């Protein structure tokens, strides 16, 4: 799949942008804060309804944007996508609420999502455009907290499988409700004698949803091992592959892929932890507490790898994610690579540029200049110079 046209209005530093895109490699280059990363952010937002860098959606609306006829300012993003199964238009509008509405506790923004001009839920948008985003901050996937690695798996699987994204949303709500009950018992706001009866329903909901998420994550990790490992070898020029191991908080299911068996193990573990969970006021096991162990030659790369190894590992995982999407869906995702070559030595830069040589894969790369790219890459890339929220053919 590929994006043929991107239209932005009052998004970040873009007052207006209409950009035609093609399959293959596109290079956006220019000084920092010119708007290169914003183009990638916009495409990612249209694919997932989430920004990879904004703390709140209201930050996406251009600061100087003015409302019309009493309508508060808004950002509008539209893209046209060609997929293996046809054409689709995606649109997201983020509108600031009027000050008086925000003052009474309403959310600061209203988000409207449309597919082919028909209003839909945000969840329904996910998967219509599949993207893989790599940014310098993504090194946290290797070096950061477990939440970073869980998010990596969730974003990948949510774009592949509509059931996964819906189950994940349901699971998160169940965890919130269950934690609310556990805190109430811990604080003495509910009688403990009813705890088992009240938790029975939520335990079943948690185990059913959690079992599906766990099964799909375990399958994905097996596939990613086979895909990302060789990519790391090619990128690093060595023969020691990257390896992944899923670490579940539910004892004994790290390699079990039968949903019913996972569900039963989940329920049994919840029963054993009942007193501990009430004492701490939170759900102690489940997909929201799991981790993904990343190693090279059996050594955890987050703790002991060099910066170059960590960055190569992160990029290998992202490119492995793209391959997994292609295999599972029959359609290649759009690759969004921000500041791709920074912190890589000359050898790794060369390997990365060779790996990206796929004319049927839309790849959009950003950089501050062109000096780090080889002539072969620059010759086949469509180049745009970005300055102060404007794009110029180069």
Swiss-Prot record:
<keyword id="KW-0963">Cytoplasm</keyword>
<dbReference type="InterPro" id="IPR018078">
    <property type="entry name" value="DNA-binding_RecF_CS"/>
</dbReference>
<keyword id="KW-0234">DNA repair</keyword>
<feature type="binding site">
    <location>
        <begin position="30"/>
        <end position="37"/>
    </location>
    <ligand>
        <name>ATP</name>
    </ligand>
</feature>
<dbReference type="GO" id="GO:0006260">
    <property type="term" value="P:DNA replication"/>
</dbReference>
<comment type="function">
    <text>The RecF protein is involved in DNA metabolism; it is required for DNA replication and normal SOS inducibility. RecF binds preferentially to single-stranded, linear DNA. It also seems to bind ATP.</text>
</comment>
<keyword id="KW-0067">ATP-binding</keyword>
<keyword id="KW-0547">Nucleotide-binding</keyword>
<keyword id="KW-0235">DNA replication</keyword>
<keyword id="KW-0238">DNA-binding</keyword>
<dbReference type="GO" id="GO:0005737">
    <property type="term" value="C:cytoplasm"/>
</dbReference>
<dbReference type="GO" id="GO:0009432">
    <property type="term" value="P:SOS response"/>
</dbReference>
<dbReference type="GO" id="GO:0005524">
    <property type="term" value="F:ATP binding"/>
</dbReference>
<dbReference type="GO" id="GO:0003697">
    <property type="term" value="F:single-stranded DNA binding"/>
</dbReference>
<dbReference type="InterPro" id="IPR003395">
    <property type="entry name" value="RecF/RecN/SMC_N"/>
</dbReference>
<protein>
    <recommendedName>
        <fullName>DNA replication and repair protein RecF</fullName>
    </recommendedName>
</protein>
<dbReference type="GO" id="GO:0006302">
    <property type="term" value="P:double-strand break repair"/>
</dbReference>
<dbReference type="InterPro" id="IPR001238">
    <property type="entry name" value="DNA-binding_RecF"/>
</dbReference>
<dbReference type="InterPro" id="IPR042174">
    <property type="entry name" value="RecF_2"/>
</dbReference>
<comment type="similarity">
    <text>Belongs to the RecF family.</text>
</comment>
<dbReference type="Pfam" id="PF02463">
    <property type="entry name" value="SMC_N"/>
</dbReference>
<keyword id="KW-0227">DNA damage</keyword>
<keyword id="KW-0742">SOS response</keyword>
<dbReference type="InterPro" id="IPR027417">
    <property type="entry name" value="P-loop_NTPase"/>
</dbReference>
<dbReference type="GO" id="GO:0000731">
    <property type="term" value="P:DNA synthesis involved in DNA repair"/>
</dbReference>
């Amino acid at each position: 799949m590929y994006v043929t046209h991107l239209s932005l209005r009052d998004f970040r530093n873009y007052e207006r942008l209409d950009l035609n895109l093609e399959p293959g490699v596109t290079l956006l280059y220019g000084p920092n804060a010119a708007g290169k990363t914003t183009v990638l952010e916009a495409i990612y937002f249209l694919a997932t309804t989430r920004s990879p860098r904004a703390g709140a959606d209201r930050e996406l609306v251009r600061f100087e944007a003015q409302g019309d006829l009493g309508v508060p300012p808004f950002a509008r993003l539209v893209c046209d996508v060609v997929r293996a199964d046809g054409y689709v238009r995606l649109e997201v509008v983020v509108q600031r609420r009027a000050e008086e509405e925000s003052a009474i506790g309403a959310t600061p923004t209203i988000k409207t999502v449309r597919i082919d001009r028909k209003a839909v839920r945000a969840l329904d948008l996910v998967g219509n455009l599949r993207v893989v985003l790599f940014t310098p901050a993504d090194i946290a996937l290797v070096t950061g907290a477990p939440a970073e690695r869980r998010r990596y798996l969730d974003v990948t699987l949510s774009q592949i499988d509509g059931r996964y994204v819906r189950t994940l949303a349901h699971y998160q709500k169940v965890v919130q409700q269950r934690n609310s009950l556990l805190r109430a018992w811990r604080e003495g706001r509910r009688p403990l004698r009813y705890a088992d009866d009240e938790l029975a329903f939520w335990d079943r909901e948690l185990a059913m949803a959690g079992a599906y998420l766990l099964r799909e994550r375990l399958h994905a990790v097996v596939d990613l091992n086979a895909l990302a490992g060789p990519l790391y070898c090619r990128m690093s020029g060595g023969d020691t592959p990257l390896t992944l191991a899923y670490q579940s908080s539910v004892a004994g299911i790290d390699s079990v892929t039968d949903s019913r068996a996972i569900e039963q193990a989940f329920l049994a573990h919840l029963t054993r932890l009942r007193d501990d969970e009430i004492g701490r006021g939170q759900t102690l096991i489940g997909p929201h507490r799991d981790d993904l162990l990343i190693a090279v030659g059996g050594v955890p790369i987050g703790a002991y790898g060099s910066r170059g190894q960590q960055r190569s590992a992160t990029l290998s995982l992202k490119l492995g994610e793209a391959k997994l999407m292609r295999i599972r869906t029959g359609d290649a995702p759009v690759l969004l690579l921000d500041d791709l070559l920074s912190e890589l030595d000359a050898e790794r830069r060369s390997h990365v540029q060779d790996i990206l040589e796929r004319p049927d894969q839309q790849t959009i790369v950003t950089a501050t200049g062109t000096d780090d790219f080889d002539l072969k890459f620059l010759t086949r890339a469509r180049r745009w110079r970005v300055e102060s929220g404007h794009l110029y053919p180069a």
